Each structure stands twice: as C-alpha cells, then as structure tokens.
Amino acid sequence: LEFVFQTVCKMAEWEFVAEVSAVPSGGRVSVIVDETPALLLRAGDDFYCIEDICSHDGQPLTDGPVEEGGIVCPRHGARFDLRTGAPVRMPATQAIRVFQVQVQEGRVFARP
C-alpha cells in the first residue's frame, strides 16, 4: 500500500522542464516528463507538452511541423492536436499523451 501511495503522489507532482526564456515563440525543446520523452512547444504565450512519439509507428515528433493547432509526424504525415493529443489526420488512429503545463515565475512545469 505504501508503494502505491508513493507512486500516486509522485505522478501528481509538477516537474520543472524548462525556463520560459529557453523556448522562443514557435520553438520547442525535448524534455522528460514522468520518465517519458516529451516535447515542449511554445506558440506565443501558450505552452504545450506532448509525448514525443507518434502513436502510428513510434517515430519521434521532434522535427515535425506545427500546423493548424497540431503537430505533424515527419514520417507519414499523421497530425495530432496539441491540446488533446487526439489524432486529426491519418494514418494515426490513437492519441498521444498530453501533459498539463503550468508557468510560474519564468519557469515551465509539466505533469501527467
């Protein structure tokens, strides 16, 4: 029971991922959230943090273009909504993980 409690508490913690100044508008950085490779993206003052793996074929999304509120997998063109992780263009049919993001005092934090 103690192990389960500690695991649940850890999962709810905010993790520091980047300084706001390290991610220019339109930029992105690779980060780790909850031991998962993730991508932190910035659009104006908004930050998004998504799992950095295409659910279709496991390709990293790191170099994919951002368009129409989503990120495009550079391999087969699947697009995922940055807010929800939902696939919005084939061939992907499964969502990717999206992490909650919070900005405090010039620092960006994320959590599952």
Residue map of PLM features:
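N-terminal pre-ligand scaffold of iron-sulfur
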Residues: 5-68, 81-82, 86, 95-112
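Short cysteine clusters
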Residues: 54, 73-76
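A conserved active-site-flanking secondary-structure segment within enzyme catalytic domains
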Residues: 90-91
